[in-house]
Amino acid sequence: MSIQIPRGTQDILPGSVELWQYIEGQAREICRRYNYKEIRTPIFEHTELFLRGVGDTTDIVQKEMYTFQDRGDRSLTLRPEGTAPVVRSYVENKMFGDATQPTKLYYIGQMFRYERPQAGRYRQFVQFGIEAIGSNDPAIDAEVIALAVEFYRGMGLKNIKVVLNSLGDPASRQAHREALIAHFKPRIGEFCSDCQSRLEKNPLRILDCKRDRDHELMNTAPSITDYLNEESTAYYEKVQELLTMMGVPFEKDPNLVRGLDYYQHTVFEIMSEAEGFGAITTLSGGGRYNGLVQEIGGPEMPGIGFAMSIERLIMALKAENIELPIENTIDCYVVALGDKAKDHAAKVAFDLRKSGLSVEKDYLNRKMKAQFKSADRLNAKYVAVLGEDELDKGVINLKDMATGEQEEVALDVFASYIAEKLI
């Protein structure tokens, strides 16, 4: 019996991986333009990091984490999200002491959640995320959202929208929390068991429930906007003003809360309205987490960030029938005819690769027709044919696969000649 891939995972094969590489390259490029630097953290962390950083009342912590005991009886968890590990690294490596603040970081990496596999949701998935730590300026909130929108637009997506809300500062959140408890408590028995347990611990999460979202009490729940104090209201309005100035359209949704406990003030999601999805689908989300650095053991430092699923992005591209400009070709295929030519072909391929070209050759001693078929399948720009006759003349036959034109080139200058054509 053959061993198969674990449920909720996928192999990304040659022919598909080029799309991923292109997307990751564009993510790195936009981060370069906004001056975000890459950070790489371990794929597993101490479980305590996520209990404190993500929140022990969240679905991620309660239901979705891959947690195990190592041989030293330490509890470790495969990272389910990227923000807490980045903040842990920020604190541990004392990045808060840098002269230039905020510290602007990005990551592209695999995350792990034990979820029910479905379209666009895997148990191992790839996130692209950014974190800006060390500034309480609404301008950085607007910048983070604008970066995400610009990235999606750069991918060609048109049917996207930004949904925005504010959860306020701790005082505003506490006032809203008390109002939510008073609103839901008399009829909490009508809600699912998750919502019942959330009532006292984190009633805001009830608004995020998928099972009870159509309950009449959801539609009449107290809105956070009614409990924002003057400072929180001013902050929220400034973020909106800056987004408008940047040409980033948005919709306000007072029920948007996000699924993690560390958010304060600005929260947002970017959604796809593409008809190919069949329903509005969240592509990415993020927000401000002013208490997280301190919770993980650092000084009081504000932060904001977002994370997006690469798998969801690829689904959105397909839903909008967008084909990215991915070049899946090689520069030259070397055809060898005969044993003597085969040895020289290896040297030709080596010299071409040294010149910076992508090159392939035959390793199965096939006939010329079969080798040309391989060159076609690999989308070779040129085919170099080397046989006994060419060796005797000290030349190589070069064919342009786009035009069909052929020419003979001296062997001793062939590498530099074709490199000049292609580089």
Curated annotation (Swiss-Prot):
GO molecular function: ATP binding; catalytic activity, acting on a protein; histidine-tRNA ligase activity; transferase activity
Highest taxon in the source lineage: Bacteria
Family matches, as InterPro entries: aa-tRNA-synth_II (IPR006195), aa-tRNA-synth_II/BPL/LPL (IPR045864), Anticodon-bd (IPR004154), Anticodon-bd_dom_sf (IPR036621), His-tRNA-ligase (IPR015807), HisRS-like_core (IPR041715), HisRS/HisZ (IPR004516), HisRS_anticodon (IPR033656)
Catalytic activity: tRNA(His) + L-histidine + ATP = L-histidyl-tRNA(His) + AMP + diphosphate + H(+)
Matching CDD domains: HisRS-like_core, HisRS_anticodon
Keywords for the protein's UniProt record, in alphabetical order: Aminoacyl-tRNA synthetase, ATP-binding, Cytoplasm, Ligase, Nucleotide-binding, Protein biosynthesis
SUPFAM superfamilies: Class II aaRS ABD-related, Class II aaRS and biotin synthetases
Gene Ontology CC terms: cytoplasm
Primary location group: cytoplasm
GO BP, sorted A to Z: histidyl-tRNA aminoacylation
Enzyme Commission number(s) from the entry: 6.1.1.21
Location of this chain's protein in the cell: Cytoplasm
Family: Belongs to the class-II aminoacyl-tRNA synthetase family.
Subunit-level organization: Homodimer.
Protein name per UniProt: Histidine--tRNA ligase
Species in which this protein is naturally found: Bacillus cytotoxicus (strain DSM 22905 / CIP 110041 / 391-98 / NVH 391-98)
Gene: hisS
